[in-house]
């Protein structure tokens, strides 16, 4: 019925992967909401994290505080290690592999210091002519 029009399409089969053993695993969740977990795998991946609720019951002050680390080996063989904190001040990560901003040029740094020391005047909008304004 389909004649020469039907041709089976090639299918993709992902390569078989070796299963990676879990060498260590722990997960602790406490009644107060605090927790801690860690794991280590046979291929060199490791992670740990702990967290707790800061100021529980205080609606505007509650904040989840979390800190942890993880590490692995990149495909090029580079060891990657990351340490992080997440709290009311946001997420902050540290690691040798993370890019860092270039230093601020000295002239700009001096300008920023002058701006910080100069008292700011309150903004006073100036009246402007508007020919389309209707009275």
Swiss-Prot record:
Keyword Glycoprotein carried by entry: yes
Residues with the Pyrrolidone carboxylic acid modification: 1
Record field: transmembrane: none
Chitin-binding type R&R domain ranges (all copies): 32-102
Record's signal peptide: none
GO-annotated cellular components: chitin-based extracellular matrix
Pfam family, one: Chitin_bind_4
Keywords assigned: Cuticle, Glycoprotein, Pyrrolidone carboxylic acid
Superkingdom per UniProt: Eukaryota
Any GO MF annotation of the entry: structural constituent of chitin-based larval cuticle
Carbohydrate attachment residues: 11, 100
Task performed by this protein: Component of the abdominal endocuticle.
Entry protein name: Endocuticle structural glycoprotein SgAbd-2
Native species: Schistocerca gregaria (Desert locust)
High-level lineage: Eukaryota, Metazoa, Ecdysozoa, Arthropoda, Hexapoda
